[in-house]
Amino acid sequence: MPNHDYRELAAVFAGGALGALARAALSALAIPDPARWPWPTFTVNVVGAFLVGYFTTRLLERLPLSSYRRPLLGTGLCGGLTTFSTMQVETISMIEHGHWGLAAAYSVVSITLGLLAVHLATVLVRRVRIRR
C-alpha cells in the first residue's frame, strides 16, 4: 500500500471545503429554472477555469515548488468551486423542458469561455515579470 502524505490530503480537503462553500453560497442566490441561463453554475465554472489556469501556471512556472499549494488551490479550491456535473444536469433539464437552443448555447458558451479563461490566465501569468 502506498504511503500517503496526509498533509497533502488535508490541503485538498481544506481547499475543497472553501470552494464548495463559495459555490453553494452563489447557487443559493438563484432558483433553478430550466427556461433561464444558469448564472451561478456558469459563473463558478468560468471563474474556476480562470483560477485553475492562473494557479497551475503560477505554481509550475513562477513559484518555488511546494507540495501543498497545488492540492490546496488547484485540486481543492478550484475542484470544489467548479461543477461540470451540475452543468450537465442543467443542460439535460433544459432539453427535457424543450429549451434545445438554450441547452446548446449554454454547453458551447460554457466550454468555450472556460477554455478561454484558462488561456487568458496562463497568458497573464507568463507576461508578468518576476520581481527580484
Curated annotation (Swiss-Prot):
The keyword Transport applies. Pfam families: CRCB. Na(+) is not transported, but it plays an essential structural role and its presence is essential for fluoride channel function. Signal peptide: none annotated. It is found in: Cell membrane. Na(+) binds at residues 79, 82. It comes from the Bacteria. The chain crosses the membrane at residues 11-31, 37-57, 70-92, 105-125. It catalyses: fluoride(in) = fluoride(out). GO terms for cellular component: plasma membrane. Keywords: Cell membrane, Ion channel, Ion transport, Membrane, Metal-binding, Sodium, Transmembrane, Transmembrane helix, Transport. GO terms for biological process: cellular detoxification of fluoride; fluoride transmembrane transport. GO terms for molecular function: fluoride channel activity; fluoride transmembrane transporter activity; metal ion binding. It is a multi-pass membrane protein. Belongs to the fluoride channel Fluc/FEX (TC 1.A.43) family. Fluoride-specific ion channel. Important for reducing fluoride concentration in the cell, thus reducing its toxicity. This is Fluoride-specific ion channel FluC 1.
